């Protein structure tokens, strides 16, 4: 009986969501923040606007429940480990 009870406790602990939350870099400050519950994906969106030639691509960093949908002209990268979406500034040559 004790073995059965212990097995049930272990299975319950393994199956429960233990409240782990992902940390992602989030714009506008590109600081690491804890994502809201249910948002376990970090993303980086980049695109060109009218100032792209002088300022570089626009960057949006954040958390999401699923990887955002790809739109024409927008590059999206998604990952699922803590702080896996760092902002790398564009360097002019």
UniProtKB/Swiss-Prot annotation:
One term under GO cellular component: extracellular region
Keyword Disulfide bond belongs to the record: yes
Expression across tissues: Expressed by the venom gland.
Primary location group: secreted
Secretion signal span: 1-21
A Pfam family hit: Toxin_cobra-type
Disulfide bonds: 24-42, 35-63, 48-52, 67-78, 79-84
Keywords: Acetylcholine receptor inhibiting toxin, Disulfide bond, Ion channel impairing toxin, Neurotoxin, Postsynaptic neurotoxin, Secreted, Signal, Toxin
SUPFAM superfamilies: Snake toxin-like
GO MF annotations, alphabetized: acetylcholine receptor inhibitor activity; ion channel regulator activity; toxin activity
Localization: Secreted
Family from the record: Belongs to the three-finger toxin family. Long-chain subfamily. Type II alpha-neurotoxin sub-subfamily.
Main function: Binds with high affinity to muscular (alpha-1/CHRNA1) and neuronal (alpha-7/CHRNA7) nicotinic acetylcholine receptor (nAChR) and inhibits acetylcholine from binding to the receptor, thereby impairing neuromuscular and neuronal transmission.
Protein name: Long neurotoxin LNTX-2 homolog
Organismal lineage: Eukaryota, Metazoa, Chordata, Craniata, Vertebrata
């Amino acid at each position: 009986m004790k073995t059965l009870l212990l097995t049930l406790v272990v299975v319950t602990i393994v199956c429960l969501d233990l409240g782990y939350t992902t940390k992602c870099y989030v714009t506008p400050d590109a600081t690491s923040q804890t994502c809201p519950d249910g948002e376990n994906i970090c993303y980086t969106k980049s695109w060109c606007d009218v100032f792209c030639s002088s300022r570089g691509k626009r960057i949006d960093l954040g958390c999401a429940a699923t990887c955002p949908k790809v739109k024409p002209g927008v590059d999206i990268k998604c990952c699922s480990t803590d702080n896996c979406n760092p902002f790398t500034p564009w360097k002019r040559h």
